């Protein structure tokens, strides 16, 4: 890995956190697209979740991605989509039956599947994690 592009850097960070630090994808999303301190200190989170988020912000502060990004990550058994916490880059998700669609714009999804059961734009920093062959 030469770390010449943003994509290489993000891939390296996710690999480090998942493979070396043994963190799950949900926690990785909380590190690279961490909530703001004011949000962490609000009533939005339980005390245990606040402590976890504070720990992540302090220990992995250098891995917070502060610029705009929108990624779709493939892993053994599924996909994760994530965009920056300010939602400077778009991300759209949709479902049709047992299919899940992820794209940067709704028109890309509609080109493949014109009629969907559900379509939404995840909040900034909200991961969409899809596992293959997993029943709801």
Model-identified regions with their sequence ranges:
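Conserved short alpha-helical segments that host acidic/polar catalytic motifs at enzyme active sites
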Residues: 1-136
